[in-house]
């Protein structure tokens, strides 16, 4: 049964199910190979929970530069327009499959903006 996004536990559910999709997608999973090999995926998921906690609940939990790791990744594994579309599609589908309510719309809107900005930034290099 779908529920509203209410807390960090819900955000963990969101990002963990989202990453299951990403890691199964042959078009995008190679971006996460190092995290899987180095066994740092769980750490990454916790960072994402902080990020979305800050975005949706304004907690101040995320204090990092979200662009920096993506710019570094782009140097070795170039991020293309299609990758951002795939990322966004999986994110939106994960939201729709598991949650309902106003924060679903807010998360989708912010994810769209984030994808657009990241795509612009990586293509500037």
Regions found by a protein language model. Give the residues of each.
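Core of compact, soluble alpha-helical bundle domains
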Residues: 1-125
């Amino acid at each position: 049964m779908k529920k509203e996004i209410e807390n960090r536990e819900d955000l963990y559910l969101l990002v963990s199910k989202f990453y299951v999709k990403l890691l199964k997608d042959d078009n995008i999973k190679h971006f996460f190979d190092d995290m899987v090999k180095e066994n740092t995926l769980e750490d990454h998921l916790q960072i994402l929970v902080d990020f979305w906690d800050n975005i949706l609940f304004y907690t101040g939990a995320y204090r990092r530069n979200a662009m920096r790791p993506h710019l570094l990744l782009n140097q070795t594994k170039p991020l293309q327009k299609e990758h951002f579309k795939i990322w966004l599609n999986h994110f939106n589908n994960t939201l729709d499959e598991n949650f309902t309510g106003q924060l679903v719309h807010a998360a989708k809107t912010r994810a769209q903006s984030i994808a657009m900005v990241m795509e612009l930034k990586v293509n500037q290099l």
